């Protein structure tokens, strides 16, 4: 964002050559002596004016030094920043203590976690031992059941053998009884053959009977043994059944005990798992807090670095404003004393608001460094606008002051062109919200300064006239007439015209005459023919060849400056001040700005003074105020105002009617 303000001060030359009675009455030999005397008087006046300017500069520098000392004594943003830094350091210490406490808690939690882990491992080992014992008991119970089943099968087999033996013995006993009965019947029915035969047969029968009895006794013994074996097996069976029931009861009781113990162990395991999870979550929270604390500590360090950089930037900016402020920026435009009280306080408050804002970390737009430069430039503009106007006391002095962003270079032709450079580095700047508030306050201060010094509009007298037309054409209109100037940038503004009437003094003290704005020049070649005709008519007794030699050079500088300003560079304002050989000509040109740039149309002006035989003079001031609405990248709505004051000196001759009425050249805005 560019901001330019052109303030022109001009001194009206004397009108000795334009008076017909003066040169006609003098003889031809005295003309060179009179010219030399006039040149000597002009040189003396210039030296006196320079001495007064140096005195004014010294006084202004002294006042500025006092103002800066008072501003340094007042509690500024450094104290607030120091308190903020102290608070941040205290907070960092608290965070460090909290970090140490969290580390201790983390160590305790880790120790508790290790204890819980060891307990959990011991419980797992006990559970494994109990599982092994239970498996072993289950195996023993299975083996006992298998042995019992085997014994039951053997008892069943023995019972079957016993029953089979009983049946066989019963059959044998029946057969023996049947055989005995048959033998008894035979003995009873058969005749006794002889005693010997009977004795033999009875002997045989007795033998068979004995043999049968022996067999029966043996069989009975075997039967008794089988019964005893059965009873023994039954006793073993009962014993085995009792052992089986006892084992079953023991197994059942062991299962119940183990189930209860397993349930208790499972509950303890669940509780330990929950505690471990809680400890892990607390550990994660602690680690997250530690990371947050580290990030906060780094952020605080970055903020401290940014605050230090902002303090250094503001200190260098104040020192650069104090050191690099030119004479024309400190000295009032018309010799009035400079007042820095209210503007310095308001600007200091606005700068304090800007520096107190929280800076961003990244992604700075390109327009912000330029806006930082505008703050320091607005300080200088407000000091110039606060200074009241005062008529000068010495003629033939031309000062052109240009406040822009560029380097300071002397103008062509021995003039003084001052262009302070205040550029801010691409450092971090405050955030958008607080910047908008601070710039709002700054805009209010500038608007109050601009609106507070507008002069009233007096009624124009009837016997005065002006030769030029002052028209500002905005919008989509375009005219070919060189008297009009069209702007393609939508602007809002106004034109204030005021006419002041005063009488010329014969002692050489005249009212200041403003500069005449030059028409737009294409490609830096030449000027319109109508303008050249006016120059030739109103510049009597001047060296035209010298002026023509300087005009193309100035126009080329103007075209080059216009091109360079479109690229973002800044050039000083070339100024031409008449020397001793050219007392009646002073020419000033300023570089034009690109219409497609961010600042809208800039003012082009030049001053050309001519002589006339007038006794009564008046000054017509045309103030053109342009307010261009711009939307920046951060959605901050700003208004840029460019004020151009063009003063036209209009004279009307009352003493001599032969040469007619003459006026100064046209002015164009």
Swiss-Prot record:
UniProt-annotated stretches for the region Tail: 319-669
Cellular component GO terms held in the UniProt record: cell cortex; cytoplasm; intermediate filament; plasma membrane
Location in the cell: Cell membrane; Cytoplasm; Cytoplasm, Cytoskeleton; Cytoplasm, Cell cortex
Protein's GO biological process: cell maturation; intermediate filament organization; lens fiber cell development
Region feature (Linker 12): 178-194
Region (Disordered): 380-435, 449-468, 505-618
Tissue: Detected in eye lens fiber cells (at protein level). Expressed in retinal lens epithelial cells (at protein level).
Region (Coil 1A): 34-68
PROSITE patterns for the chain: IF_ROD_2
Positions of modified residues (N-acetylalanine): 35
Lipidation (N-myristoyl glycine): 432
Quaternary structure and partners: Part of a complex required for lens intermediate filament formation composed of BFSP1, BFSP2 and CRYAA. Identified in a complex that contains VIM, EZR, AHNAK, BFSP1, BFSP2, ANK2, PLEC, PRX and spectrin. Found in a complex composed of PPL (via C-terminal linker domain), BFSP1 and BFSP2 in the retinal lens. Within the complex interacts with BFSP2. Interacts (via C-terminus) with MIP (via C-terminus) in aged lens fiber cells.
Protein name, entry field: Filensin
